[in-house]
Amino acid sequence: MKLSRISAINWNKIQDDKDLEVWNRLTSNFWLPEKVPLSNDIPAWQTLSAAEQQLTIRVFTGLTLLDTIQNIAGAPSLMADAITPHEEAVLSNISFMEAVHARSYSSIFSTLCQTKEVDAAYAWSEENPPLQRKAQIILAHYVSDEPLKKKIASVFLESFLFYSGFWLPMYFSSRGKLTNTADLIRLIIRDEAVHGYYIGYKYQIALQKLSAIEREELKLFALDLLMELYDNEIRYTEALYAETGWVNDVKAFLCYNANKALMNLGYEALFPPEMADVNPAILAALSPNADENHDFFSGSGSSYVMGKTVETEDEDWNF
């Protein structure tokens, strides 16, 4: 069998400047959950009711499931369709950071929660029909041989499906609760925003090579898939937040982010403003300066703790 020639990646010869731009953004944004002082949230966690704690654990377990899908199936499936080696490299970075995101929720659990409560949430996630359904819908497209439909599914996961879960820590943060946990979630949101934008960009570039009929067919597919996911997400939200009185607020947040997902694909918003009218407190919590602890763009700040080096002299070690 004749082996094909393998070419080394050359970052000094870029076919698409967006690959380097996004690579630089992702690497400059790099972070790890161990650097966020989650233990500072223990007092606030203890003020939550048992129902609020259970809701939070379930929300984060659902998010862990989505990150796991994107890490082991989503980004790797997109790599097979990459046009440039630099695109493959960016997608490998995306895959790794999805693993970091999944690890982050385990850091929250080990810091704030009892093991039996977390185990119960994981068991719940495996038996929750809407949660399992959205995973199945997305995975079905990841294993298909249609590259652009994979990208559509990936953008909807990155830019839409996460947000029924992201709403809760932003809500608590807007009330001064679990602020360090919210800082960690903002780091995740920052990553997901870049992921959704980049994959949507690659989708739009690929569309330019298609006929008008093919483009229209993909648009209709995207809208149908979004509505299938939206209807399922409404069921998930109504069940998850049933006892809270927050269901309508979360639904508005879903519509808001569904519109953003469509825009990442180059399409117009679907949901009217009155359906996507998000509570200003939530939008403020999402903003880069939402918490004084957190520097959104550099990943630094008092809630993201990096070690500092100080030069010493020999006499410093004479105790």
UniProtKB/Swiss-Prot annotation:
Residues reported in the UniProt entry to bind Fe cation 2: E98, E158, E192, H195
Annotated GO CC locations: ribonucleoside-diphosphate reductase complex
Oxidoreductase as UniProt keyword: yes
Any one GO molecular-function label of the UniProt entry: ribonucleoside-diphosphate reductase activity, thioredoxin disulfide as acceptor
EC number annotated for this UniProt entry: 1.17.4.1
CDD domains the record matches: RNRR2
InterPro entries: Ferritin-like_SF (IPR009078), RNR-like (IPR012348), RNR_NrdF-like (IPR026494), RNR_small (IPR033909), RNR_small_AS (IPR030475), RNR_small_fam (IPR000358)
NCBIfam families per record: PRK09614.1-1, PRK09614.1-2, PRK13965.1, RNR_1b_NrdF
Name the record gives this protein: Ribonucleoside-diphosphate reductase 2 subunit beta
Organism: Salmonella typhimurium (strain LT2 / SGSC1412 / ATCC 700720)
Annotated gene: nrdF
